[in-house]
Amino acid sequence: MSTPARDPNTAGTAALSPFSTPNHELRAPGPGEAHSPFTPTAAPGSQPAGSLSDPEDGPDPTFNFYIQGHRRRPYDRQNRFGKLESEIRETKSQLETLRQELKHLQADVDDLKETVYAAGTSTASTSVPPSQPNSPTPTATTPEASPAAPTTESTETTGPSVATNATEPSESRPAR
C-alpha cells in the first residue's frame, strides 16, 4: 500500500506551526461544527455561541462594524451632529432666558437702591448723624484766649449748617 502524496506547498508546514492543516482538510464547517478549532462545537441543530442569531448575545457588533459600517457612518454622523445642533440651540435659548432674568433682577436691584437712597436721605435731613451733633464741639482754644479766631455761633442757623449739607447727599440729586 502506498501513502497518498502530500501537496509540496504544505510539506513541512506542520513542523513550523502546530495550527496549520493540510490543504485537503481545509473546508467550510458543516452544520453544528465550530468555525475554528478554538471554539467549542455547538449541539446539533443549534447555532454556535456568539453567532448573529444568538438571542442571548444579540447581534454581533463586529458584523455591523465591518460589513455595514461604511453605509451607516454618514447617517450616524448626521444624527450625531443633529443632536449636537439641537443641544446648542437649547443651550442658547436657556442662555437668553437667563440674560432676560438677569436684566429684570438688575432693574429690581436698582429700584431697591433708589428706595434705600430715598429712605436714607429723608431720615438724614430730619435727624442729625451721630458723627455731627447739633451743638458745636468745644475746641482747645476758647474765643477769649484767641480773639482773632472766628466763632461758630455767628454762622449757625436754626436748620442744619451749611457744612453739614455739603457733606450729606442732597435730596435734589437726580435719580438713576
Curated annotation (Swiss-Prot):
Keyword Transferase part of the UniProt annotation: no
Protein name per its UniProtKB record: Avian agnoprotein 1a
Subunit note: Interacts with VP1.
Species of the source: Budgerigar fledgling disease virus
Bias (Basic and acidic residues) ranges: 75-85
Disulfides per UniProt: none
GO cellular component terms listed in the entry, alphabetical order: host cell nucleus; virion component
Keywords of this entry: Coiled coil, Host nucleus, Host-virus interaction, Phosphoprotein, Virion
